[in-house]
């Protein structure tokens, strides 16, 4: 009996997290189909899990980045620039894919929804201004409000300052980083219970009946995201590593994308991505900075959402869009997507900004936003899964490419 209990505990604490998450997913679907009331009650597990991830993510980013920079050795490469380049290429490519799909399969919206009582940003300048204000945020406010741009700036600043500290100070910061990482691993082990609660409560609250009216729009949105995740991203990774990208792509989708799909929060998925980078044996100096940065600016899914819904509104109103305008929309959508994390409501509230390019009034644009909220159960989940899994994917591609370069240099030196 004790042996069976120890085996069960070992499976819970050390077993495959992906298998456990799939079990939680299946259990959530079964519970929602059997008892709506019980499924709603189980939602507390999901709320607690997402809350725990959001609670630990800001302090994790602060301590990890600070420790990484404080203990950084002179001359050691961090590879942030090539990672940023891939982030921008990936986001712009996603916007282009969304334009092509919207032209090939134009969607029409029933624009009769009530305009939401929310205020979108008035222009791209306001979005950029919001990002700049995030940079100079009070560090306590940045931690409390999960302002990752502000947290990164303070972490980098403190890390540089601590590089001039004593060895014992650096050691203490490193120990703090290890302690927070250990807490994160404990939280992540509760992912199956969290996913179980999230799936059960979501299905009990909304079901999928409300989504059928927007089936065509959802097919274009989800199709675009699948195309980016399974075709465009692998091509970018292949260009970087010059070998089969799919083992890496599928692992990132499985271990990062699945969790992100159900938490629907790039910030909450930061600890999951950090743990996956550690498992992939990537350079900590690179991923400790690039993961929180990716959660802020690497927004391929958001670029697709903004582009598809904006073009759907234009098509509904009979507005003709030429190729140069479509390309300009791709650029604007990419810039908007990079600022999505700094706007309450994310990518949906940046749709009016893109709609203004075509002279679409704010009232109609806000009705498009309302449609976005209706389909958000799937749209937001898929968007977050693409955004978050791409962060790890591109970091891994850059790290593998750099490792290959170093190996080639060593080989040539030996000849």
Curated annotation (Swiss-Prot):
PROSITE patterns per the UniProt record, alphabetical: NA_DICARBOXYL_SYMP_1
Record bears the keyword Cell membrane: yes
Coiled-coil region: none
Coarse class of the protein's main subcellular location: membrane
Transmembrane segments: 21-41, 45-65, 85-105, 142-162, 193-213, 217-237, 289-309, 331-351
Reactions this protein catalyses: L-serine(in) + Na(+)(in) = L-serine(out) + Na(+)(out); L-threonine(in) + Na(+)(in) = L-threonine(out) + Na(+)(out)
Name of the protein in question: Serine/threonine transporter SstT
